[in-house]
Amino acid sequence: MSASRLISRDPYTGEAIADFAVNDARSIDAACHSARAAFAEWAMTPLAERRAIALRFAETVRARREEIATLIARETGKPMWEALTEADSVAAKVAISIRAQDERAGERSEPMADATARLAHRPHGVLAVIGPFNFPMHLANGHIVPALLAGNAVVFKPSEKTPACGQLMGELWRAAGLPDHVLTIVIGGGEAGEALVRHEALDGVLFTGGVQAGRAIHRALADAPHKILALELGGNAPLVVWDVADIEAAAHLIVQSAYVTAGQRCTCARRLILPEGARGDALLEALTMLMDRLVIGGPFQSPAPFMGPVIDAHAAAQVLAAQDRMTADGGRPLRLAAVREARSALLSPGLIELTDAPLRDEEIFGPLLQVRRAADFDAALALANATRFGLAAGLISDDEALYRRFWTSVRAGIVNWNRPTTGASSAAPFGGVGGSGNHRPSAYYAADYSAYPVAGLESPSPVYRLPIGLNP
């Protein structure tokens, strides 16, 4: 990316997809002020009309499903089958968000003796949405849909890795009839993001992405408590496997947890916690055998791959550097992550045992899973909680009593039992605790931060009865 141009590249081939002009501070200023002007009319647009536009957006997405998925696959490198599921999720978000708005941010009234108590919700104003590259349309859309339904105007900056998906998002909303400047797309990297976050016309920032960027946004808004801030910052998810009879099924769940989307989901398992001894050894043997059979390749190849490349060569280098650090710490490589094809960000999955190595609490955003052993379940729980993050956690076990202990003890916002750690429902809260962020972004509870509650006492006419005395 130059100071004025941004080239989107295919992570698998390295080929250029599109070339974009980068928004500078002046154009971002214009976008924010245009959004502020558009907000006034959009907020007064009847809710039924705002919902009708959102429903047309969902219809447009369904009608252009293949086109959308193809662009997602090209720009992220994820397999076409997975890109299709993302396109479907973009459309499905509308109905979910409408229901969430009714249930969590609708209007309520309660009769009183001489008035009516009313609860309603108002939009904040102009919200910035800053999206990630791993689900460039689905996760950003999880902020955009509830924000627009609530009556906000939105300035959306997609990841600099996936600008074409961001531009397509704007095109789809325009095709649905969204008025001009209610949703504005700005393109750029860190400088554009900083100019957007610090803009005086904003009423809040909704961010999904890395920890460092999220903390920088938090600091930038530290003296602006009037601005809403929703952060989803990733995780270092533990997956505990304990007292399970079907080892092969457990291995499949581990692979789904750690390596889907080339390990580039914030809910991916980063730490596999196994029992010491023969049971743990058997699990690792089944896991490595399954890893050796995984199909890895380009997004459009046949047969379809399980996983494609990471987002770019820099991301691949970061994964390999983390693997080198783990090995230097005394880790025992069971399968080494390695670049599979020249000029590509395609990595094979890595697995490294670190039971006797120091704990490093970091999110490795790629297909690299570390293994640690525990003497008993209490020790496994302690290892699971040995992180400042708290997004997702999982237990694979036949013992429901162990799961109840896990559920009440593990510190995470998403806790799964005998399902991949990456499994989540858009109809349920999504988000974590600790270093994983605040609020519950991109899902059902996004309605909570898209509008603020307003309480009032209402009477159709003045009440003239005067008190005969005053309270002492």
Swiss-Prot record:
GO molecular function: succinylglutamate-semialdehyde dehydrogenase activity
Active-site residues per Swiss-Prot or TrEMBL entry: 232, 266
Binding site for NAD(+): 209-214
An annotated GO BP: arginine catabolic process to succinate
SUPFAM superfamilies referenced in this protein's UniProt entry, alphabetically: ALDH-like
Pfam families named in the record: Aldedh
EC assignment: 1.2.1.71
Catalytic activity annotation: N-succinyl-L-glutamate 5-semialdehyde + NAD(+) + H2O = N-succinyl-L-glutamate + NADH + 2 H(+)
Gene3D superfamilies the record matches: Aldehyde Dehydrogenase, Chain A, domain 1, Aldehyde Dehydrogenase, Chain A, domain 2
Signal peptide residue numbers: none
Pathway(s) this gene product operates in, as recorded in its UniProt entry: Amino-acid degradation; L-arginine degradation via AST pathway; L-glutamate and succinate from L-arginine: step 4/5
Keywords: Arginine metabolism, NAD, Oxidoreductase
Source organism, top-level taxon: Bacteria
InterPro entries: Ald_DH/histidinol_DH (IPR016161), Ald_DH_C (IPR016163), Ald_DH_CS_CYS (IPR016160), Ald_DH_CS_GLU (IPR029510), Ald_DH_N (IPR016162), Aldehyde_DH_dom (IPR015590), SuccinylGlu_semiald_DH_AstD (IPR017649)
Stated role: Catalyzes the NAD-dependent reduction of succinylglutamate semialdehyde into succinylglutamate.
PANTHER family: ALDEHYDE DEHYDROGENASE-RELATED
Family classification: Belongs to the aldehyde dehydrogenase family. AstD subfamily.
Designated name of the protein: N-succinylglutamate 5-semialdehyde dehydrogenase 1
Annotated organism of origin: Caulobacter vibrioides (strain ATCC 19089 / CIP 103742 / CB 15)
